[in-house]
Amino acid sequence: LIGLMVYFLMTSLGEMAAYMPVSGSFCTYGSRFVEDGFGFALGWNYWYNWAVTIAAELVAAQLVMSFWFPEVPGIYWSAIFLGIMFGLNVISARGFGESEFWFALIKVVTVVIFIGVGLATIFGIMHGVESPGFSNFTMGDAPFVGGFQAMVGVAMIAGFSFQGTELIGIAAGESENPRKNIPIAIRQVFWRILMFYILAIFVIGMLIPYTDPNLLKNDASDISVSPFTLLFERAGFAAAAGLMNAVILSAILSAGNSGMYASTRMLYNLALEGKAPRLFSRVSRSGVPRNALYATTLVGALCFLTSAFGDSTVYTWLLNTSGMCGFIAWLGIAISHYRFRKGYLAQGGRLEDLPYRAKLFPFGPLFAFALCMVITLGQNYQALVGERIDWIGLLATYISLPLFLAIWLGYRWKKRARFVRYHEMDVSPTNT
């Protein structure tokens, strides 16, 4: 369901980004097609989302490095990796692009090998490894262990894993020939989701039962409990734990690197639109908005809270906060696209003139909006139904919602902003 939702969201974003490529992406679209305060709140929410994600990834890096160096304090590793991410982004956009290419290559090769080994095991090709068939899907409470509550609870984490797909829209403002390249990138999203997410999860479900004692350890710092590691070890790869640890580290650096790029560009665009202090609009000779980069790096330093509260606790806080912010951003994409298409047609626009058209409109954005709402509001409803209300749990899960509403409504009240009517929308592709 999350994969299908993300696919519809990316086709929605692709339609707008190919027609109107801007660095502000869906935040600019929110201002143009919904209401100025809505775009303002989306922009700050998205900057905060990725800035916090950087901190979350740096905490994850601490957990990964503890596998090799358990005696070294985690904050040292966070400082080192924060410096690496900063260095890759401060040079130029090319530095970000080159590093992401190699990070992505490592992940792609690993997932392809994982799927290949998994399928070979499923079909009984791997020598000495017995195929469980479909038994793991039929045993006990499988495949829907925990029922609806568990599905909603895990949806936020699944959504966190998909976050970053919307970077296509952010990069559109700096890409060459976006009217041609954005549609190509969007069309590849379906196959990437199918192969790298759905197929990999299918392989894990087929080969590793939910009752596996390794999965119940609940130790985030133990790489041996990773489903990827378990599968490789059972296929006879003795060094699987160390290898997967290195791959996961590269994935963490990739996610943090992307977060640094996205949040910096978002803050820069907010400054250009007058929605953030003007000092964040200044760029270096190589085109890097360094003041925005400095501010983002400062928020990323939240990872150092682990020295006071513990790495696993801080990681959970940051993961919940970032996950909720990501779903708010996706809600903004769905709303903006629905209104863009309506406004575009209301002003006499022709679908044939769009460089890319989202499939199954209006079902796509409406489905994505509805599912986002269910997951966002129902994420931690169990905190309300127990004998005592878990106020700390509620705060950790939902803090992003009141912050978003406060920013939106505060801006709306101060600027006297109003919703944009379909006939008044700026749908000009050249006014970017």
Model-identified regions with their sequence ranges:
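Helix-loop-helix junctions that connect adjacent transmembrane segments
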Residues: 72-73, 105-242
